[in-house]
Amino acid sequence: MLGDIGEFIRGKRFTKADYADSGVNVIHYGEIYTRYGVFAEQALSRVRPELADSLRYAERGDVVLTDVGETVEDVGKAVAWLGDEKVAIHDHCYAFRHSMNPKYVSYCMQTASFIAEKTKYVARTKVNTLLISGLSKVKIPVPYPNDLERSLAEQSRIVAILDKFDALTNSISEGLPREIELRQKQYEYYRDLLLSFPKPGEAAA
């Protein structure tokens, strides 16, 4: 379960009035499902530097996810933070701090099986809200869970494969919509297939 392999750290609020051309790097929850992909090395927004001490931060390697969204699919959308410096996160974001490959965790959070499990813990009100206490019970596949070195090596191998598919899918600047759609479906199929081995505590089929 996610709660067994890491911890969730909630961000702190900042508003549109706090934005500035320079200052503290921040991730707003709305940017995660509109402007970020699987991972990010640079923040897209900044707030006034005098807010620095009042904010809460994600560190390099954390996976930042949203807890609200207009759709159930948007809720829990994740981005692995790979920037050299920490980044402040909005209070509708959580930083998942763990010891796994951050891109691997981010890819896992995109799979159909994870989304299906995640939806069990979404409170469907005017704004869909993710219950972190529930999300912490969701499992992700951990290769070789009893051998950290081997596990990290396998996570890196899977990430390298998925990175290639992700680059192919998202780097298309021209092409027929049908071709792009087919490539996206192919990517999603192989991503889910690569990440479909038994989760800790489950027996192999």
Segments predicted by a language model, with ranges:
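Charged, alpha-helix-forming regions
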Residues: 1-205
